[in-house]
UniProtKB/Swiss-Prot annotation:
Record-linked SUPFAM superfamilies: Glucocorticoid receptor-like (DNA-binding domain)
Entry protein name: Ribosome biogenesis protein RLP24
GO cellular component, as recorded: cytoplasm; nucleolus
Keyword Cytoplasm: yes
């Protein structure tokens, strides 16, 4: 099974997928999807379309010149089967893939190195040249005032609820004390009435 690269965007064309165009001179052009086929028929330049691998490599966004990439070239000359050769090739393939991924990560990290500083300086220059960007608009001020009022009302309501709860507790305790006093008085009256009767 061979996985071909799309002639236009260089993404993989798996078996049973995509379109193949064969020119009069028997040259084969494989496309991963109809988007690439249409662009090819319109004679679009892949280096000028930002979503193609050709653009990314030409613009320096991806690793273009590296020894690990030479291993991925097509070899149409068949080699006589040799078990040891196949074993060493499979080992080498996994090792080369690891090295390529490591180099790509390093390339990306190096490319993105100064972005934070650049963005900060650009934003700073923008704010310095347009100070009105930092000024709050009337609508935002009104919203802020409304939020503050809502917070104050909520805190006032909480205070009212707490004070009501405290007053209820106090009134309950007073009512209990009055009941106890009444009970004591009733007991005293009974004792006195008994004494009087005898």
């Amino acid at each position: 099974m061979r996985v071909y690269a799309c002639h236009f965007c260089s993404s993989p064309c798996y078996p049973g997928h995509g379109i193949m165009f064969v020119r009069n001179d028997a040259k084969e052009f494989r496309f991963c999807r109809s988007k690439c086929h249409k662009a090819f028929k319109q004679r679009r330049n892949p280096r000028k379309l930002r979503w193609t691998k050709a653009f990314r490599k030409a613009a320096g966004k991806e690793l273009a010149v590296d020894s690990t990439l030479t291993f991925a070239q097509r070899r149409n000359v068949p080699v006589r089967y040799n078990r040891e050769l196949v074993a060493t090739t499979l080992k080498a393939m996994s090792r080369i893939e690891e090295i390529r991924q490591r180099r790509e990560r390093a390339f990306y990290k190096n490319r993105m190195k100064g972005n934070n500083e650049r963005d900060f300086l650009r934003d700073k220059a923008l704010v310095e040249s347009n100070p009105e960007l930092l000024r709050l608009r009337e609508v935002e001020l009104a919203r802020q005032a409304a939020k503050e009022e809502a917070i104050e009302q909520a805190s006032d309501e909480e205070m009212d609820i707490e004070s009501e709860a405290e007053s209820e507790v106090e009134s309950e305790s007073e009512a209990e004390e009055q009941l106890q006093k009444q009970k004591i008085l009733l007991k005293n009256k009974r004792k006195n009435s008994k004494r009087i009767a005898f």
